[in-house]
Amino acid sequence: MKPLAIPANHGVMGQQEKHSLPADFTKLHLTDSLHPQVTHVSSSHSGCSITSDSGSSSLSDIYQATESEAGDMDLSGLPETAVDSEDDDDEEDIERASDPLMSRDIVRDCLEKDPIDRTDDDIEQLLEFMHQLPAFANMTMSVRRELCAVMVFAVVERAGTIVLNDGEELDSWSVILNGSVEVTYPDGKAEILCMGNSFGVSPTMDKEYMKGVMRTKVDDCQFVCIAQQDYCRILNQVEKNMQKVEEEGEIVMVKEHRELDRTGTRKGHIVIKGTSERLTMHLVEEHSVVDPTFIEDFLLTYRTFLSSPMEVGKKLLEWFNDPSLRDKVTRVVLLWVNNHFNDFEGDPAMTRFLEEFENNLEREKMGGHLRLLNIACAAKAKRRLMTLTKPSREAPLPFILLGGSEKGFGIFVDSVDSGSKATEAGLKRGDQILEVNGQNFENIQLSKAMEILRNNTHLSITVKTNLFVFKELLTRLSEEKRNGAPHLPKIGDIKKASRYSIPDLAVDVEQVIGLEKVNKKSKANTVGGRNKLKKILDKTRISILPQKPYNDIGIGQSQDDSIVGLRQTKHIPTALPVSGTLSSSNPDLLQSHHRILDFSTTPDLPDQVLRVFKADQQSRYIMISKDTTAKEVVIQAIREFAVTATPDQYSLCEVSVTPEGVIKQRRLPDQLSKLADRIQLSGRYYLKNNMETETLCSDEDAQELLRESQISLLQLSTVEVATQLSMRNFELFRNIEPTEYIDDLFKLKSKTSCANLKKFEEVINQETFWVASEILRETNQLKRMKIIKHFIKIALHCRECKNFNSMFAIISGLNLAPVARLRTTWEKLPNKYEKLFQDLQDLFDPSRNMAKYRNVLNSQNLQPPIIPLFPVIKKDLTFLHEGNDSKVDGLVNFEKLRMIAKEIRHVGRMASVNMDPALMFRTRKKKWRSLGSLSQGSTNATVLDVAQTGGHKKRVRRSSFLNAKKLYEDAQMARKVKQYLSNLELEMDEESLQTLSLQCEPATNTLPKNPGDKKPVKSETSPVAPRAGSQQKAQAQPPPPQPQPQHKINQGLQVPAVSLYPSRKKVPVKDLPPFGINSPQALKKILSLSEEGSLERHKKQAEDTISNASSQLSSPPTSPQSSPRKGYTLAPSGTVDNFSDSGHSEISSRSSIVSNSSFDSVPVSLHEERRQRHSVSIVETNLGVGRMERRTMMEPDQYSLGSYAPMAESRGLYATATVISSPSTEELSQDQGDRASLDAADSGRGSWTSCSSGSHDNIQTIQHQRSWETLPFGHTHFDYSGDPAGLWASSSHMDQIMFSDHSTKYNRQNQSRESLEQAQSRASWASSTGYWGEDSEGDTGTIKRRGGKDVSIEAESSSVTSVTTEETKPVPMPAHVAVTSSTAKGLIVRKEGRYREPPPTPPGYIGIPITDFPEGHSHPARKPPDYNVALQRSRMVARPTDTAAPSPIQQPHGHPASGRPVNKPQWHKPNECDPRLAPYQSQGFSTEEDEDEQVSAV
């Protein structure tokens, strides 16, 4: 019997833990908002300031919220500074851009429902969430679905609670959803189970008993439990549902019977596993309603188990000869070409297969299918660029051309000489020539095209396979030969084509595309024809295309019904002759019409503006379209300038100025198009008289041009920068082939080497370092602040563009240690932008597997195009791959491949738009500008409106086009942004960035005030400079005592209890299965435990509701490091930031930076005080226990993190603790300090930067990291010897560090460089150098400078008794305790409600003591780790950290450390004075009556 069914600690588990372990802190964002939150506030709220009842991300809600609630959001109690009032062009957009994309935490809602009440949709939501957990690995989907239907949700509020006792009877199988538990075995060994692990019974009804004692290690542990009876029934039922297919006595395929809903209408058998041959054969077998995506899944994933695609191709050609299989074979080939045309391009064998298959279709007279095949080929073919050289102009061309605008076609290759260079370059019959040497060939006469090709010896040719139109051309030519007269098609004829069959519709579309440009006269008809076609397509979209290709396909559905067309199939009219060959899961076959229409040709509307000059420097604005040629521009310019000459006498010239000041002038060919895109910033178009040799551009004009071409970031519109970033990112994202994900995931060799994927992967690092480079190269502090503000705005607009990738990269760049340490720069940032920045970070809160980001991404209101966060995609795919076996019992595990294919399809849909992304992103920007009011309509719906309704698009655009000059200026701005982005010089070396950072703001040294307390002055490499450095003066540092024994490491290994969902109902005990029936209390264990804190949670429900309202309303921290808000910190703010996040930051726990879990560092007595008092200020002095004075006011956001600092125990570097002042008397007993820290969204400022493909674990640190976290990463070059104060004390900004009991045998003086290196080596993807340290303005606990002035404490204003260094007496303190501060006062009082708060410590994070690392181990490199390395580092380390009661801790005053109760976390132990405070009796507590003041005890 297996008492504990604990899955092996698979590598993937570490991954998953990395993402999901931290509890969800959305509930904890405390605010000053007076607007009550809706009661169903979910954990997925982005924490921003505005929440709409519907949870909708549409901006219509946001607009209203902005006008009502947010109207005072940015202004209440916050005096404007000069920077705040800057009137930028897009300043007004910020309000709207800052509004959050909210969504409910659907998973939590589903879990809290009674299993009987769960709907099919609820089960699908749970299925989607659970399938990523290691406990469910290798289970079939039906088993998972059944388990999701019966699972019960349970929460254990407090750390240290016994869940199961040794010998207790087990009666359920449970999976940890959040937090971690420790099992202590009778022999003393301990094992830690983390998120995704399971424990409990095995699938049998035999009695099983617990071995060992299981305790929760962190607060807010969440579990789902399945009763033993249900678990046994479901797992044993699997065999009954299995259908095994045997051949010659061997099992070749296994199918499973599934029911996808409770109606019984959708049930059947689905392939689970099989041999490669049998899976291939299944392509042409009947597929049940529950397995509609088998063909798509197979075609995407066959490459993982077949060596060559021709193994499938040969079978298909063979089966085509069987009339009964012919239609099915054709459907497979159509889907293959449509979905993965790259399998055919560039592969001669597959190209021959395609040609043979076309011949077979022609032979069998399957014209409709053939047409569809050609459409798919044309739609999916990629543009190819090839370069040909000729020995001389007279040399013959190695190919023959057909077509030309005179026939209504483009230029096509009819034949290519075999063995020629053109053949080697890849030119082949049926290719359409799109461009030669920059000249557009899509609308050109054949004779002119031949002339251009002959007159150039160097040919740069852009071609694209377009067999369909090529065959139309051949048909037309043969008709002309028969009839003797050329036929010029009329585009208007399309209106006669009211047929809705797919092939005919496709023909019409292609006619528009291929024939629209018959001649110049027909251009107007072309536009009209396109509009008519669009109307037809719009009318038929109901029957052919999904109305919302992204939305209706069921985001929340399981893989079984993913986008398989269960809803759409019934809409396809029976009249379609080829309905059997189409899968509605791949509407691309039909969307390709749109794509060809919108991407291959551009609207002929004059949507661009040229500024054309004459020699006398007069200029006119000329409206053109993308395809307008230089000759046409000359004609318009002559008309505009009222010149009375013929167009032949003039030409268009481009004059440009090189950076050296050389003026270049060239005449443009008459047929040159895309003129607006070609002009450089340092160039102008001139109308030149061919008969004159006048100087077009004088030297003065040239100098002006040169000046205009020199641009800096601050000159650029933030909206335009975000637009261009989004366009660039989307183009890269859209070009990723689905097969590249598979090749990359399974490490397969491919022709392209996943080139597109790698490019998209690199972008996030490039953009991250761009941010840092731009900020650190600016030497002027005010400009630096403005650049930071500029980037925050850009990130906000990226969110509007749904460009989460760039948004994340920018936040990462601002969090890079060299940027984060710029304390004085960040202090100048206006308060409004602090809030906006915190909101941005909040969206990427890593808790519960990025729940907020995922909920936003899956929001029903979020329509493509979306640019998702790539590291999350990579992480999800990696988890699916590594969490499931590729082969089971010698058979291919197709269930795994199906899940991976579903995920890739889901990602691909984000790029499935029916319009040019450039047009789409620009439409949003123009709409803002042209409509004036920013609060009309929903921006999220803008894309959809524009994409689906041509009229709306035209209307919006025309409103912008009325002013040619304005349009030109917008286009000029876009050109500036493009040039700026293309010429970026990135500094990718973090060492260099750190050097630049130190040049911007040199590190300051800590000089002791008292002569007797002199300590070695630390060099400027002190890793963390608390942010308050400028306001605090160094205080005396007592001589450190002898190093203390390391045995006190377990002193308080508990994270404060955090009630993540304070306003949520608890599941009644009676409704849940018990963990053990023989427990001492004879209670149903976990469920009853989860009830213990419910009373207190309910008491504070109202306040929590308010506090959840938004982080925008809650005065987020100014700088990258967050600081205590209205609560008072026991430890110096610097240290608080630096370590208090220990549990909540990814690095400290997952990456296992040397923290020993989040210790319960706040003494019991403090907790009790916190319960009774609203705000506590504890000023640490060298004299003794801090005295807490009660503050009389009640403010919901007065939480500061208590008890997160204690990593000092293991680090021996720092011990800190903050006391959280809470709005309710009972609140902290459950919520503990975690809630307090939530607003520390900046805490992510730390190390979540260079996010390459492997950075799925990186995302964790986004919100919860501080400068201190990076401390251990990159500073191996620091010399710690001889510094009693150690790393942290060395900075002049060092704040006081509070608890001596956490000291380890490493005193500060002994903190060796190795210890940092060891920590560094554990770091995950965070900014891999630790520049958080160096002077890092790690002290977010400090006050912001207002208007350039330090907000120091005035005794008169704050009634706080500050303890100055003169008053302090040296008291023996642990070596790691440094009492330093950069202000003369012991307290810093901040007014106006700008509160910083120490970062949160995620429950469930288990840090690793520095002593666990071997000496001398160091990080191999400073670059972000390789993906696999990061994966390995993300694992949780099982240690018996909590098992034994802590040994007494040597206190300076001899007080023993309080031990931890077995069943009750120390945090909650009331009315007991904690001796740990004894050494720090404070002389300086005072009450504050002014509710606008904030005091940080430092």
From Swiss-Prot:
Chain positions with Phosphothreonine modification: 644
Amino acid composition bias (Polar residues), ranges on this chain: 1246-1257, 1306-1330
Domain N-terminal Ras-GEF intervals: 267-380
Localization (cell): Cell junction; Cytoplasm; Cytoplasm, Perinuclear region; Cell membrane
GO MF annotation terms: beta-1 adrenergic receptor binding; cAMP binding; GTPase activator activity; guanyl-nucleotide exchange factor activity; PDZ domain binding; WW domain binding
Biased composition (Low complexity): 1110-1124, 1140-1159, 1354-1365
Location of the Ras-associating domain: 606-692
Keyword Nucleotidyltransferase in record: no
Domain notes: The Ras-associating domain is necessary for the Rap guanine nucleotide exchange activity. The N-terminal regionis necessary for cAMP-binding. The PDZ domain is necessary for its targeting to the cell membrane.
Main subcellular location of this protein, as a coarse class: other
Residue positions, PTM Phosphoserine: 501, 806, 930, 933, 1022, 1079, 1088, 1094, 1115, 1119, 1158, 1175
Keywords of this entry: Cell junction, Cell membrane, Cytoplasm, Developmental protein, Differentiation, Endosome, GTPase activation, Guanine-nucleotide releasing factor, Membrane, Neurogenesis, Phosphoprotein, Ubl conjugation
Domain Ras-GEF: residue ranges: 717-944
Name the record gives this protein: Rap guanine nucleotide exchange factor 2
Disulfide partners: none
Bias kind Acidic residues: ranges: 83-94, 1487-1498
PANTHER family, A to Z: CYTOSKELETON-ASSOCIATED PROTEIN 4, RAP GUANINE NUCLEOTIDE EXCHANGE FACTOR 2
Residue span(s) of domain PDZ: 385-468
Main function: Functions as a guanine nucleotide exchange factor (GEF), which activates Rap and Ras family of small GTPases by exchanging bound GDP for free GTP in a cAMP-dependent manner. Serves as a link between cell surface receptors and Rap/Ras GTPases in intracellular signaling cascades. Also acts as an effector for Rap1 by direct association with Rap1-GTP thereby leading to the amplification of Rap1-mediated signaling. Shows weak activity on HRAS. It is controversial whether RAPGEF2 binds cAMP and cGMP or not.
Alphabetical GO biological process terms: adenylate cyclase-activating adrenergic receptor signaling pathway; adenylate cyclase-modulating G protein-coupled receptor signaling pathway; blood vessel development; brain-derived neurotrophic factor receptor signaling pathway; cellular response to cAMP; cellular response to cGMP; cellular response to nerve growth factor stimulus; establishment of endothelial barrier
Assembly behavior: Found in a complex, at least composed of KIDINS220, MAGI2, NTRK1 and RAPGEF2; the complex is mainly formed at late endosomes in a neuronal growth factor (NGF)-dependent manner. Interacts (via C-terminal domain) with NEDD4 (via WW domains); this interaction leads to ubiquitination and degradation via the proteasome pathway in a cAMP-independent manner. Interacts with MAGI1 (via PDZ domain). Interacts with ADRB1 (via C-terminal PDZ motif); the interaction is direct. Interacts (via Ras-associating domain) with RAP1A (via GTP-bound active form).
Family of this protein: Belongs to the RAPGEF2 family.
Record PTM text: Ubiquitinated by NEDD4, leading to proteasomal degradation.
One annotated Gene Ontology cellular component of this protein: perinuclear region of cytoplasm
Region (Disordered): 40-59, 68-101, 1002-1048, 1094-1159, 1224-1257, 1304-1371, 1392-1498
Ligand binding (a nucleoside 3',5'-cyclic phosphate): 135-252
